[in-house]
Amino acid sequence: GAMNDLFLNTAVIISGHEKVVTRAYEEESQMLPNDLALLDVDQLIINLDKKYPDYFWSPRITFGGLLDIPDKNGETRDQGPVFAIGIDLLGDDSRMSEIWELDKNIVKGRLPQNFDEALISQRLANKLNVSIGDTATYIGTTMYNAFTTYNFPIVGTFDLHKGQADNQMMLVDISGARKALDMENAASEIF
């Protein structure tokens, strides 16, 4: 029982049950190399649905960087590293909230309702002294290795009860991740 839950929960965060990535991305996956991401993802998912109709396929973008929390004057109040995951939270047919059990894991606030809204782990919120309604600025690189900053309003905090796995985690809708990282119709992986 407990071991099955552990393996299932880890599979949800790390990969899903089956995963499609580029060979180059797989070789460098610990570096979160979105410059090696899948392209034309919409068509890839259509093809996967036809070939493997018993599976549920969904794109995901994993990315890391720095999360900057400004004060009332727009100056840095606090900042820290972030591991972020863009999943389909807003799609009509999406099951990501169900698969991730977000409804029962929300500590404060609500689920994102707009593409640019974010959930952060309760631990990260405590570390950065973030409140619901604050804006967090993601600082990182696009899939073309260009410098980027993107503002995500914080609408909720979560605790996935995964120990260190969700210690520095932020969850956003994949459309927000795509906009922040210049990854239109691209994804780190399909799972």
Show where each model-derived region lies:
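Alpha-helical transmembrane segments
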Residues: 1-20
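A structural signal for hydrophobic secondary-structure junctions
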Residues: 23, 27, 33-185
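Extracytoplasmic/periplasmic membrane-proximal domains and adjacent transmembrane bundles
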Residues: 188-190
